[in-house]
């Protein structure tokens, strides 16, 4: 496995982690080894996502950078957004969804690296998005104070809910039966069947990251050193532990055959991996820690898996041809308010706008090599300087 982390210093770190042999009476420990540092962007990194082959990073430089973890090479950059990349999510190995401060949500073919669809999702910034485990739905929140549900089968808005405040995190549970929406230090728990708030969890500080460990247990980190475990049914805090000496910026969790592992990154520059006990009331044990000496912003873990069946899109979300009329209708409907939540459509392989393939890449949607990207950036800077001199 490989821990990857982005920082304000424009660098992506990679650390290979291997379990150490455990002797009798000794605590389990993992050994991290520095694998690579990649100066991927010209501004601070803001988001990272991983699948079984690639690591992608988003930045304030408005680009999405791709790194091939199998070959350990720079795979180029995606240039479509006109704003800071705020969120990146893979669904399996075929699709990447990105959100940015330009209000757009883009769906990318993660094989040919082409933009399949671009949606005007929010009137303000897109602050976060989350994909349902089935691949049929997605949720997004933005600075326009709305929570939006997207039908990924037909490629259009399904429901818009005004939430009166700007949420900065939304996250589905592992089975997709509930989801949470985070506003400052408040976590609202929603049930999918009712689309209404079933309860509210209040954290002591502003929440910076959440991750579900199970359908009912939610891990919460905020602008403090402490990580807490909450029960989403009883809305109570099961336990808490001090993870860092400074605020926790991001978290990532995954399962091994033996136990759950929680990875935390802090603005103190440390990345820590924790072994979680089955009883969440018992404090976790530290597996390893990594000092990056950087101001960390985002975190991910690349697991070297040959197959990714658990996250594969369902048959209804597989790419299929889209008629011109259907495409035009989807574009008109995307981003418009829907007064009532629509009934979920039956799976139809003939309709798949968001995850449909495009044989003709449009301008600005295809993969850009690292060399070409740097040339474009240099020309853009010269153009801006020339414009300033002409104005003077």
Curated annotation (Swiss-Prot):
Superkingdom: Eukaryota
WD repeats: 40-77, 80-118, 121-160, 202-240, 243-284
Biased composition (Polar residues): 355-368
Function: Negatively regulates the PAK1 kinase. PAK1 is a member of the PAK kinase family, which has been shown to play a positive role in the regulation of signaling pathways involving MAPK8 and RELA. PAK1 exists as an inactive homodimer, which is activated by binding of small GTPases such as CDC42 to an N-terminal regulatory domain. PAK1IP1 also binds to the N-terminus of PAK1, and inhibits the specific activation of PAK1 by CDC42. May be involved in ribosomal large subunit assembly.
The species this protein was found in: Bos taurus (Bovine)
Gene responsible for this protein: PAK1IP1
Summary of subunit composition and partner proteins: Interacts with PAK1.
Transmembrane segments: none
Basic and acidic residues bias: start-end ranges: 325-351
Protein name per Swiss-Prot or TrEMBL: p21-activated protein kinase-interacting protein 1
Cellular component, GO annotation: nucleolus
Location(s), subcellular: Nucleus, Nucleolus
Upper classification of the organism: Eukaryota, Metazoa, Chordata, Craniata, Vertebrata
């Amino acid at each position: 496995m490989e821990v990857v982390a982005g920082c304000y210093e424009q660098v992506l770190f990679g650390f290979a982690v291997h379990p150490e042999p455990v002797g009798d009476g000794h605590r389990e420990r993992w050994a991290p080894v520095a694998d690579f540092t990649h100066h991927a962007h010209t501004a601070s990194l803001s988001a990272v996502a991983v699948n079984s082959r690639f690591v992608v990073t988003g930045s304030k430089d408005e680009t999405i950078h791709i790194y091939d973890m199998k070959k350990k090479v720079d795979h180029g950059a995606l240039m479509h957004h006109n704003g800071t990349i705020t969120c990146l999510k893979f669904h399996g190995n075929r699709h990447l969804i990105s959100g940015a401060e330009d209000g757009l949500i883009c769906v990318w073919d993660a094989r040919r690296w082409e933009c399949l669809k671009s949606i005007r999702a929010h009137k303000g910034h897109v602050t976060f998005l989350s994909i349902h485990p089935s691949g049929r739905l997605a949720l997004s929140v933005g600075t326009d104070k709305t929570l939006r549900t997207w039908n990924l089968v037909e490629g259009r808005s399904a429901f818009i809910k005004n939430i009166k405040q700007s949420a900065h995190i939304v996250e589905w549970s592992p089975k997709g039966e509930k989801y949470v929406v985070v506003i400052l230090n408040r976590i609202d728990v929603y049930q999918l069947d009712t689309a209404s708030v079933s309860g509210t969890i209040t954290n002591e500080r502003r929440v910076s990251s959440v991750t579900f460990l199970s359908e009912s247990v939610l891990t919460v980190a905020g602008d403090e050193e402490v990580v807490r475990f909450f029960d989403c049914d009883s809305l109570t805090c099961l336990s808490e532990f001090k993870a860092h000496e400074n605020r926790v910026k991001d978290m990532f969790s995954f399962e091994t055959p033996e136990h759950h592992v929680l990875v935390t990154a802090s603005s103190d520059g440390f990345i820590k991996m924790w072994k979680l006990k089955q009883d969440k009331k018992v404090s976790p044990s530290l597996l390893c820690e990594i000092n990056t000496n950087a101001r960390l912003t985002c975190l991910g873990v690349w697991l070297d898996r040959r197959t990714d069946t658990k996250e594969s899109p369902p048959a209804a979300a597989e790419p299929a041809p889209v008629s011109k009329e259907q495409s035009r209708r989807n574009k008109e409907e995307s981003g418009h308010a829907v007064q009532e939540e629509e009934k979920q459509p039956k799976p139809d392989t003939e309709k798949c706008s968001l995850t449909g393939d495009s044989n003709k890449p449009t301008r600005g949607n295809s993969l850009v090599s690292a060399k070409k990207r740097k040339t474009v950036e240099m020309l853009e800077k010269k153009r801006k300087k020339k414009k300033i001199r002409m104005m003077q």
